[in-house]
Amino acid sequence: MRFTQQLFALAATATLATANSITFVNQDATQRTVYFTPSAGLQQIDSVVIAGNDQAKVDIPESWIGNAYSVSDGAANVPGMLAEFTFNGWGGLTYFDVSAIVNPNDLDGVKELYPASELTTQVKTLISGCTVFPCSTAYYHPDDVQTVTTLETDFICTLGNPTTEVAREVKTELVPRKFVLGKF
């Protein structure tokens, strides 16, 4: 009986250690809905409504590949800036970027994407996107070398326009798009 309990506890701990999440932080008073688009054949994630100046944490399935975008309350559901992810990809890495390819004119949606461990750091080294677009840390063209990698699996995604603007132009470690797609 005791062995079974220990085995169950170990399995639960392993599950927690490999959990993926994105915390969406709404930086202004506008309510937003975040929509998820999985790659073909992967699990759909329900959309989430985030009140103005609030946040919501969303659990992401193991090895999930896809994107998320936000739509401001009252606006048409049109994809804008995309938060793109490959969780637990090649080499156990999570690949991520903010993509302006679909709609570079979206100034109110996804802004920045970075590991949760960098939330309190002044200068973020693993970041994609920016507070004011255009910037050099967003993905603008197919095969752009703007994808960032990390072993971390918990992320922060900022939405909307912060009340204080801080420009972050930090050199980040980038990898070619083929690794994100698993095409070596």
Predicted features along the sequence, with ranges:
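Fungal secretory targeting signals
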Residues: 1-21, 180-184
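Extracellular low-complexity, O-glycosylation-prone Ser/Thr/Pro/Gly-rich "stalks"
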Residues: 22-48, 56-65, 70-184
